[in-house]
Design a protein with these regions (language model features):
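Sec-dependent bacterial lipoprotein signal peptides
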Residues: 1-24
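Beta-strand-rich domain onsets/edges
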Residues: 20-32, 36-41, 118-129
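A short, amphipathic beta-strand motif
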Residues: 33-39, 79, 132-139
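Short, ordered, surface-exposed loop/turn motifs in non-cytosolic proteins
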Residues: 42-63, 140-160
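Short, acidic Ser/Thr/Gly-rich low-complexity loop/linker segments typical of extracellular
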Residues: 59-80, 158-174
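Short Pro-Gly-centered beta-turn/loop motif in secreted/extracellular proteins
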Residues: 77-93, 168-191, 209, 219
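A short, solvent-exposed loop/turn motif at the edges and junctions
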Residues: 86-115, 193-202
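Extracellular beta-sheet/turn segments enriched in Thr/Pro/Gly and aliphatic residues
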Residues: 110-129, 133, 200-221
Length: 221
């Protein structure tokens, strides 16, 4: 009787081992990044923000030349996110956050902060976007020598129109309109120097630029 039960017992043990084997397998180590994204202007938690990690790695003593995607996801209703990706030898790592109507953010992270299966925390503040539409108009009979020089000053952010360079417009070309994407809910200082037959004029002023809308700025001379 014992000899008949022995093969059955072996079969049952094999089945149990097959079932338990996957649960006993050691999980591959991962990096974990968590945080929350809020509006810089209001402090409100932002849902639906696309968050992603890019990395440059070292493998076989070879340094990867470009950033490659490592993980991506989006924030939930309370603005939080969690990203996981396989462990590699990190050389550089950065977090990207983007949402419609907000200025994208790129944050450089310290590779040495990342340890296998340990959480690294990084919160993000996104600036709401706005636009300013500038119109420079010579309302008189424009002379060739007429000149207006215009620039935004003291802008503490990257903006195609806000780098401090002068925009110079001569004579008949003075009817000009251009638009810039800027941070919302800020005061934006501007400077205009006008040289014309009707007289010279210096304008130094500021413009309030609400978030999510386009604010007009018209200078006539």
């Amino acid at each position: 009787m014992t000899s008949r039960k022995e093969p059955l017992r072996v079969i049952l043990m094999v089945i149990v081992l097959v079932i338990l084997a996957p649960s006993c397998r050691k999980k591959d180590p991962v990096y974990i990044l968590e945080g929350q994204v809020r509006s810089h202007a209001t402090g409100q938690a932002l849902s639906g923000v696309t968050v992603s990690v890019e990395q440059r790695t070292v493998g076989g003593n070879v340094f990867s030349g470009a950033f490659t995607p490592a993980a991506s996801g989006s924030t939930i209703s309370d603005g939080t996110y969690r990203l996981e990706w396989p462990r590699e030898q990190l050389a550089e790592v950065q977090l990207l956050a983007a949402k419609a109507s907000y200025i994208p953010a790129t944050i450089t992270l310290d590779p040495e902060d990342f340890l296998p299966d340990e959480v690294v925390y990084q919160n993000v503040r996104l600036q709401p976007e706005a636009f300013v539409e500038v119109t420079l108009t010579n309302t008189g009979e424009a002379a060739v020598e007429d000149l207006i020089r215009f620039r935004f000053t003291q802008a503490s952010f990257d903006c195609a129109c806000c780098n401090g360079d002068w925009k110079e417009i001569w004579g008949a070309d003075a009817d000009t309109t251009f638009s810039c994407r800027i941070y919302g809910d800020i005061w934006l200082k501007y400077w205009a120097e006008i040289t014309a037959e009707s007289g010279n004029l210096l304008i130094i002023d500021s413009l309030w630029c609400p978030a999510f809308v386009s604010t007009p700025l018209v200078i006539e001379y």
